[in-house]
């Protein structure tokens, strides 16, 4: 975590104060400040978003820890607001938001992003940060991006790319690429799909009726902690041959993470507008 601590020391005082208010979450094998590190990455990514000060932002897939929600609320300022949409995985969301001091800017909405309970043009910008991989396939993703473009005239999409330039990025991908296969075998659900190339993100936008304005790749250079999952999940898979193959892959990925750590892959960013 030395790079995170160095980046934090170099950050604006307001950013340090914001992250200091984010609670420490001891979640082995992660360090207690893993959530603060992830939020710093989101702040980096959102510097590339066309956010308006005092604007209204719709976030699709705010998740259980408000990892992008709180940075969004910080960026829009005290007069802005974030409509935080999430279907079911609220977890510690409300407690983390309350501790951050951003609660008056954040409006959580329980909803299915395929049918957003919002009028047309309810927001200035719709965003999905590191969430496309959880939208359960291309058809679903297109439908949700289409809804985002109905609720806001512009969208901002950011997602990790299937690129590894360092051993620590390779360690992340080795574990992350197991998630889809393991979850499908263990529960029959397809969640955390493999990362898609930047061109695929752009094609999703175009299929949803959007027009790409800009595309870029961002190098983050920060640790990442969200690929790891318990070995016991693999141990519960019934088909013996499949279980053994996946256990071997899990052990190899875990060994890589212990040796090299785990870093964010490059992040693909797409900004688009409604046609």
What are these regions, as identified by a protein language model?
Residues 156-181:
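Conserved class I S-adenosyl-L-methionine
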């Amino acid at each position: 975590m030395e790079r995170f601590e160095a980046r934090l020391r170099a950050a604006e005082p307001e950013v340090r104060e914001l992250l200091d208010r984010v609670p420490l979450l001891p979640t082995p094998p992660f360090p207690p400040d893993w959530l603060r590190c992830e939020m710093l990455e989101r702040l980096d990514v959102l510097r590339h978003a066309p956010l308006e000060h005092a604007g209204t932002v719709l976030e699709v897939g705010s998740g259980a820890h408000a990892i992008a929600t709180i940075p969004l609320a910080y960026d829009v300022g005290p007069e802005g607001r974030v409509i935080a949409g999430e279907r079911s995985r609220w977890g510690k969301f409300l407690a983390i938001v309350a501790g951050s001091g951003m609660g008056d800017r954040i409006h959580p909405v329980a909803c299915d992003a395929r049918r957003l309970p919002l009028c047309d043009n309810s927001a200035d910008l719709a965003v999905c940060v590191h969430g496309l991989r959880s939208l359960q396939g291309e058809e679903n993703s297109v439908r949700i991006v289409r809804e985002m473009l109905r609720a806001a005239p512009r969208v901002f999409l950011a997602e990790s790319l299937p690129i590894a330039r360092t051993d620590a990025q390779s360690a992340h991908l080795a574990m992350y690429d197991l998630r889809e296969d393991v979850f499908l075998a263990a529960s029959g659900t397809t969640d955390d799909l493999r990362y898609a190339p930047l061109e695929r993100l752009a094609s999703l936008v175009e299929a949803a009726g959007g027009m790409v304005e800009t595309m870029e790749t961002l190098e983050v250079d920060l640790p990442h902690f969200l690929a790891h999952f318990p070995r016991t999940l693999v141990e519960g898979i019934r088909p013996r041959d499949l279980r053994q193959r996946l256990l071997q892959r899990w052990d190899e990925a875990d060994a890589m993470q212990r040796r090299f750590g785990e870093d964010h892959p490059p992040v693909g960013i797409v900004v688009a507008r409604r046609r």
